[in-house]
Amino acid sequence: EAEQKRQIMEVLKTGDVIGIVSPSHVAVKNDYDIFRKGLENLGLRVKYADNLFHRDELGFTASLEDRVSDFNSIIHDPEVRMVLFGGGLGAVDIVPYIDYDGIKADPKYFLSYSDGTSILNAIYANTGIPAFYGQSPGEFGNVSEYDKMQFVSNFLEGNVHEFKKNSEWTTINAGKCTGRLIGGYSVNFALTLGSRFYPYSMDDDYILLIEECDMFQSVRSFSTYLNAISQNKIMDKV
């Protein structure tokens, strides 16, 4: 079923619309206008969600209502072919309110990383439609040649099953395996794995991807999250 849904999503074409939302942080318009220009330079159009630049009374993110409204409005927008969002904190807040039936009715590309992986995993687990770990809006402000190449190759040329190595990556134990890729930011995945919005079938095999940044977590904290993940029954299928 997931592969059938994948086939429905055509590669992006010149003039296609990227919808930008911000479920995890306060978006600053001056910055996002720069990110927007980077996407437009690739021949794409950009649509900001209505409440993208709002913030709540604490100044941390837009309100939950605004973030849910933005995300579901972008889902229902037939013109939008990719939904792009960044990281921060708070993406998991909107997971119970996402219109998963709306996503299944009109499959789009969902692209994010870090805190946004809470949403990527929920979309895949509840719809069977692949979501994509990759660039956030900020990468397009001064996009590197590698990020540009990967984005164009994956989404404008359709080479989503090909990965070209970045020289900064290091392989510790080489090998080959097959399975469905799950995972994401370590603390998010550890805290949400097994909840009702993250149901994983024990009939599938999985490849586990874990993201961490030493700016935000200590080795001790990362070890705690990794051990919590390793004690989940899903690891029998990894």
Q: Which residues does each PLM region occupy?
A:
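ATP/NTP phosphate-donor binding region
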Residues: 4-79
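Conserved beta-alpha junction segments in alpha/beta enzyme cores
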Residues: 26-31, 35-38, 177-215
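Structural motif
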Residues: 81-82, 207
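N-terminal glycine-rich "phosphate-gripper" loop used for MgATP/nucleotide binding
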Residues: 82-92, 113
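Short, acidic/small-residue loops that bind anionic groups at enzyme active sites
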Residues: 98-122, 130-137
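Conserved anion/nucleotide-ligand pocket segment
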Residues: 130-194
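Internal helical hairpin/lid segments
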Residues: 200-238
